[in-house]
Design a protein with these regions (language model features):
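Alpha-helical/coil-rich non-catalytic "connector" segments in signaling and regulatory proteins
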Residues: 1-144
């Protein structure tokens, strides 16, 4: 299992700034997903508990109020954290920061790295961890 605090072992975290949700670093990450068009149409059915959500907030470029709506919906689903590439918004609205702090969901801001590098780094770790757990269970069954 990988929790948000464990991201410190990844090089890309040097480019992350924790903007909110300091008390939620123990949340477990089960997958990495991108928030894109869902913020426009409000359909978050493809998101799940434990998702680490990465976005550049393009969907809210002309409607910043969509940020709060999207974050609120995703937090209610139980996502583990958000990472926002600061292309369109250099900072988040104060009500979004307050929501993340209140619900203890970490929100990171970043700029100088590719979204793909973050996704691949976390996904590779999750896969290798999953494989390790599988082989550990298999070995335990042989030894039992």
């Amino acid at each position: 299992m990988l929790d948000v605090a464990s991201l410190e072992k990844f090089d890309f975290l040097n480019n992350f700034v924790l903007a909110a949700g300091h008390n939620g670093l123990s949340r477990t990450i089960s997958n990495v997903v991108i928030l894109d068009h869902e913020g426009i149409d409000g359909d978050f059915s493809d998101f799940h508990e434990g998702d680490f959500v990465i976005t550049n907030l393009l969907f809210a470029k002309n409607s910043p109020q969509k940020i709060y709506f999207s974050f609120e919906a995703l937090i209610s689903i139980g996502v583990s954290a958000f990472a926002v590439k600061t292309v369109f918004f250099k900072e988040l609205p104060s009500e979004v920061i307050e929501l993340a702090d209140k619900k203890e969901v970490p929100v990171f801001l970043f700029n100088d790295i590719y979204i793909e590098d973050v996704i691949l780094g976390i996904t590779d770790h999750l896969r290798s961890s999953s494989n390790y757990n599988y082989y550990e269970t298999l070995l335990d069954s042989f030894l039992a």
